[in-house]
Each structure stands twice: as C-alpha cells, then as structure tokens.
Amino acid sequence: MALKTFKPVTPSLRQLVLVDRRELYKGKPVKALTEGKSSSGGRNNLGRITVRFRGGGHKRVLRNVDFKRRENLNVPATVERIEYDPNRTAFIALITFPDGKQSYILAPQRLSPGDKVIAGESVDVKPGNAAPIGSMPVGTIVHNVELKIGKGGAIARSAGNYAQIVGRDQGYVTLRLNSGEQRLVHGQCFATVGAVSNPDHMNISLGKAGRNRWLGKRPHVRGVAMNPVDHPHGGGEGRTSGGRNPVTPWGVPTKGKKTRSNKRTDTFILSSRHNRKK
C-alpha cells in the first residue's frame, strides 16, 4: 500500500506521513473472534510503574489471531477480507473454512480477498500457506515461524518482516533473520510462506506528539534532563553529558551491553546478529 501525505493546513499535517489504508475493510471485526483488552498503564498489581512511559491511548479490542495454524489441516480456506488491527503493525486477514468456521491470520504481502490459503504437511509455496518449515524448499521467504513445535509463531510477525530458509540438516532448518542472525529451527515447526504485510510502516511519520499519545506512549524523558535523585545521569550545572558510561535508571549498563542469559538455547544460534556490527 502507498504512503499518504497531507496539505500543510496545520503544523502537524506538514510532517504527517501515513499508510494509505483505503483498500482495507472499513467495518468492525468479527465479534466472536474478539475479546476485551484492559489497559495497565505500565503498572503492576501493586499499582507501581514497572514499564515507564506508558499510559493513556485509545481503547482497543483484541483480535484473536491464529498464530498456530494447526487446526483444520489440509482444508482450504477463503480470504474474506484484509483488516486493520490496532494491536500490531501488520494487517490481519479474515479467512473462512468450508464448514463456516472463521479465524484471523497475519496477512502476508500479495494476499487479496478471494484467495485460497491452506495449512498442512505439504502445501504449495504460496503467500498465506502454512506448513512445517522442513518441508519448504531452501530459499523460501517465510514469516510467523515457530520456535517450539505447536506453540505458535514467534519469529517475523511485525509489519514487513520475514526470514529466509538458507539450509537444512539433520531435521533442523537454518534460518536467516532480518537482523542478520542465523539460527536453527526444528523442521516440524510451522511457518507461513511470504513476508508480513504493511512494509511501508517503517516510513510513516506521526507528525505530532499527540499521535504518540493516542498509541499509549508517554514522553520518554532523558536521564541527563533529570535530577540526581531520579537518575545516575541527572544533575550538574547547565547541560552535562552524563559523566559516565550510559546506564539505566538502576545503574545497569545500556546502549550495547549484552543482556542475553539463555545459555540453554545458545547452541541454536549459528551466527549472532551482533557479529556483523564488528
């Protein structure tokens, strides 16, 4: 979909660039596939802020998106429409099975209303079709890739994202991710063919601070703009550069400090995304 700019009638419209969503369905979602979503404002059960700079925003309704694609195997479904989803950057597709059952899936690029999609052990390499990643040919572009068999897609789910199959060996598939990381995924993990829809999301410009507030994002205050009681970078006469290596408000090194501690799955990462930056 194309990008949309506006005549600069107001200062915020001068910078505003949005994705043109005219081709999307304009009605409400299927009620049976939705549920309410309560907002926490970044607070935990004690009412204390655990995630800073969150709160407010427009009320949302959760769409139950099928990330597993393991029900109704080998049964073709018809794409009814492509919809906007406020809870993610990608678009979603409503699909209908011959028995009348409906579900939402992540909409890949080049998927249109009226198309047929299917999930099964061996399917055509066509956008929207889902299958075990081990049954797909090397070079295939995929998204919504499972890391654990049957748990549902975890990799490449945001707008414009994808991974590429670059090899197969001993029941495992080698994936190249957008970050540059190469990792092993079990061949029985499901993945969906194609790249995620809405690739132009990376080019939007919100145009004003209020549009970020509509998304539930509050102002992100820099540490050097705080007082010493609030942040290690705070204080000083006039503008200062912090006086120490960048840290979080709790003194943990940031901006490049590695925080991964899951040694159990290190063996599945063949090439780290950090290696190409050296």
Curated annotation (Swiss-Prot):
SUPFAM superfamilies the UniProt entry points to: Nucleic acid-binding proteins (SSF50249), Translation proteins SH3-like domain (SSF50104)
GO CC term, one of those recorded: large ribosomal subunit
InterPro entries attached to this UniProt entry: NA-bd_OB-fold (IPR012340), Rib_uL2_dom2 (IPR014722), Ribosomal_uL2 (IPR002171), Ribosomal_uL2_bac/org-type (IPR005880), Ribosomal_uL2_C (IPR022669), Ribosomal_uL2_CS (IPR022671), Ribosomal_uL2_dom3 (IPR014726), Ribosomal_uL2_RNA-bd_dom (IPR022666)
PROSITE patterns noted in UniProt: RIBOSOMAL_L2
SMART domains, alphabetized: Ribosomal_L2, Ribosomal_L2_C
Keywords, in A-Z order: Ribonucleoprotein, Ribosomal protein, RNA-binding, rRNA-binding
Gene Ontology annotations of biological process type: cytoplasmic translation
Positions of region (Disordered): 224-278
The keyword Ribonucleoprotein belongs to this UniProt entry's keyword annotation: yes
Molecular-function GO terms, alphabetical: rRNA binding; structural constituent of ribosome; transferase activity
Subunit structure: Part of the 50S ribosomal subunit. Forms a bridge to the 30S subunit in the 70S ribosome.
Family: Belongs to the universal ribosomal protein uL2 family.
Function: One of the primary rRNA binding proteins. Required for association of the 30S and 50S subunits to form the 70S ribosome, for tRNA binding and peptide bond formation. It has been suggested to have peptidyltransferase activity; this is somewhat controversial. Makes several contacts with the 16S rRNA in the 70S ribosome.
Protein name according to UniProt: Large ribosomal subunit protein uL2
